[in-house]
Amino acid sequence: MAVYLLAVAILFCIQGWPLGTVQGQVMPFMEVYRHSVCQPRETLVSILEEYPGEISHIFRPSCVTALRCGGCCTDESLECTATGKRSVGREIMRLSPHKGTSEKEVMQFTEHTDCECRPRSASGVNSRKHKRNPEEGEPRAKFPFV
């Protein structure tokens, strides 16, 4: 066993430790970039947020995994947006406290299949930066002699 551990230690010294195994190891740029681009990625989705009308039930688990668009775009005026979607089923347990029952069932969730960086909608970042109180009205030019 000691010989095996020594061989593994020598191998790691020659080839380097696998990524993420040693605290402080730096992830190479291309790997960082590949993980950060706009793409479908596994996301936890709350069942009650997807089905807000089901508040009288308890779900187990309370959230499920689904692929949703996420990641960075090359410009702040763009956002990662779904360009393709599909419906997927997830088996969950529905508990009805008022009836004292529980049953397994399949619920449908939207999953993103394709993503693309597209211009932000009117409610995006740019409009948030310049949002005004409706009572303020339109901005007016101020002149020193008025």
From Swiss-Prot:
Q: Which residues carry this modification: Pyrrolidone carboxylic acid?
A: Q25
Query: What CDD domains does the record tag this protein with?
Result: PDGF
Q: What is its main location?
A: secreted
Q: Where in the cell is it found?
A: Secreted
Renumbered to this chain, the Basic and acidic residues biased-composition regions fall at: 133-146
- Keywords carried by this UniProt record: Disulfide bond, Growth factor, Pyrrolidone carboxylic acid, Secreted, Signal, Toxin
Q: Which residues does the annotated region (Disordered) include?
A: 118-146
SUPFAM superfamilies documented for this protein:
Cystine-knot cytokines (SSF57501)
InterPro entries, per database record: Cystine-knot_cytokine, PD_growth_factor_CS, PDGF/VEGF_dom, PDGF/VEGF_growth_factor
PROSITE patterns from the UniProt entry: PDGF_1, PDGF_2
List this protein's GO terms for biological process.
induction of positive chemotaxis; positive regulation of angiogenesis; positive regulation of endothelial cell proliferation; positive regulation of mast cell chemotaxis; response to hypoxia; sprouting angiogenesis; vascular endothelial growth factor receptor signaling pathway; vascular endothelial growth factor signaling pathway
Its assembly, as annotated, is: Homodimer; disulfide-linked. Interacts with VEGF receptor-1 (FLT1) with a high affinity, whereas it binds to VEGF receptor-2 (KDR) with a low affinity. Does not bind VEGF receptor-3 (FLT4).
Q: What job does the chain carry out?
A: Snake venom VEGFs that may contribute to venom dispersion and prey subjugation by inducing vascular permeability and hypotension. This protein induces an increase in capillary permeability after intradermal injection, as well as a drastic hypotensive effect after intravenous injection. The hypotension is mediated by nitric oxide (NO), which is produced by VEGF-activated endothelium NO synthase. Also induces angiogenesis in vitro. Like other crotalid VEGFs, this protein interacts with VEGF receptor-1 (FLT1) with a high affinity, whereas it binds to VEGF receptor-2 (KDR) with a low affinity.
Q: Its family?
A: Belongs to the PDGF/VEGF growth factor family. Snake venom VEGF subfamily.
Identification of the protein by name: Snake venom vascular endothelial growth factor toxin
Supply the source organism for this entry.
Bothrops jararaca (Jararaca)
